[in-house]
């Protein structure tokens, strides 16, 4: 895969790996540095740290459990590393099955969650039968009921619904509506495609996006978006599918009260303890990155108006 899992992984390094691992020399150097770090911290055997509480748990196999962790009623923990600390302890609850997974400080995994080959970052909450495979979660991500496969869930990614599937995408500050779905099997070539939903994107109930796709910052997606939209330079938009046609309302989301509610709630919901801030979280919604997209979007819209005039019901943009 494109992301190497190790204890000190954060969202910035993971995103860097995903973006630049086509550079073979860079990939080799990163692998060397990470393997050196792993070698320094590798233990010859599994161990259980101080003040750990393990109750009614069926199987703990080849797992490193750090201090002040509580494991209560788990079904199986195999080949895992649990990075609990006295200030930010980890809780593993009833029915949980975790295999080959790293769980970071302050996280809780509860209520029959099933995870395989995953990384769980600091202060994440995963519960209520959520199923995850080959996925990574960072900094205050909240996952419940649904499933994730090959998903890059950055800080404050949120999915609450049983019928939601996050697959083959990179998300952050994202909220998945009920029955949200993605497909990374375009052209029947197998699961080789992926997409990016930039910071603050939301998908409405029943939304579907066919990858590859690139959705701009703080956009909202409605319906079945089938034609690989790339709206990176049109942030704060509504993307609405009617049949085979997708309509884009540029800047629509910047006028909604929900956007400003989200902007204010995220800093309050950062429950990471001091000393466990691995991922760098920038809460500013207007940054050089997002403002640059706004300026490019303004230029695109001005060119459309110049080409088609002002007396039209809609503009065609490819």
Pin down the residues of each PLM region.
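C-terminal non-catalytic accessory extensions
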Residues: 309-318
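Glycine-rich hexapeptide-repeat left-handed beta-helix
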Residues: 1-25, 83-86, 91-100, 105-117, ...
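Generic hydrophobic, helix-prone segments enriched in Leu/Val/Ile
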Residues: 29-30, 34-35, 60, 77, ...
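Short, T/G/N/S-enriched strand-turn elements that build extracellular solenoid repeat scaffolds
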Residues: 50-55, 71, 92
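Low-complexity, highly charged intrinsically disordered N-terminal segments
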Residues: 1-54, 60-62, 79
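Catalytic alpha/beta active-site cores
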Residues: 68-70, 79
